[in-house]
Regions:
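Helix-turn-helix
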Residues: 14, 18-56
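Alpha-helical DNA-contacting segments of helix-turn-helix folds
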Residues: 51, 58-65, 72
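A secondary-structure capping/hinge motif
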Residues: 55-57, 108, 117
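Amphipathic alpha-helical packing segments from all-alpha helical-bundle domains
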Residues: 70, 84, 100-101, 113-139, ...
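Helix-loop "lid/cap" segments that line or gate small-molecule binding pockets
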Residues: 92-95, 105-115
Length: 185
């Protein structure tokens, strides 16, 4: 059965969207192609008419997650206290408990690092956030300070997600949030 180019393009985007959410929620390695395609009502073999490999899908899914983050961050960084708004959103309970809807860096970065080859897409996602943070900072070393802030946010969110004790998870977010805000004056 032949499908129109429009249908194929829509299916392609559905696969990317679902993969993006699953990679952020479950991890790249834990997301199998067969269950991914089955969840979309598609066959495993049909995957290869859309992508050459899982690695290609990973890059496209990471780009889609980055695009989603760009939209959210544009709103946050347009507020009166943009860095505070970003820190609050990044270290929110919602972001902690809904990784499939959040920044891809905490969930995907460790696996991307273990792949053995850097990802230009992860560089782009990270650099977009660093620029936005840096643009809110005053004084010296704004580039270095933006790296410290983003690294702290990603690390705190990742730690809060990996502990079993919900009180400790909340403390990690709260203490990090307060510390980052205090350090900014």
């Amino acid at each position: 059965m032949r499908y129109s180019q429009d249908h194929k393009a829509q299916t392609h985007q559905r696969i990317i969207k679902e993969a993006s959410a699953r990679f952020r929620r479950d991890g790249i390695g834990a997301t199998g192609l067969q269950p991914l395609m089955k969840a979309l009502g598609l066959t495993h073999g049909g995957f290869y008419s859309h992508f050459k490999s899982k690695d290609e899908l990973v890059e496209k899914a990471l780009q889609a997650a980055g695009d989603e983050a760009d939209v959210v961050c544009a709103e946050l960084f347009a507020q009166d206290r943009p860095l505070d708004a970003f820190i609050d959103a990044y270290l929110s309970q919602r972001h902690q408990t809904c990784p499939d809807q959040g920044c891809p860096l905490p969930t995907m970065s460790s696996e991307l690092g273990m792949r053995g080859q850097p990802s230009p897409t992860s560089d782009a996602v990270l650099n977009a956030r660093l620029r936005q943070i840096q643009n809110t900072l005053e004084g010296d070393d704004t580039e270095k300070r933006s790296i410290v802030i983003m690294s702290t946010l990603v690390g705190a969110l990742l730690l809060s997600r990996c502990v079993e004790n919900p009180e400790l998870a909340r403390q990690i977010l709260d203490v990090t949030r307060a510390s980052l805000k205090q350090s900014q004056g």
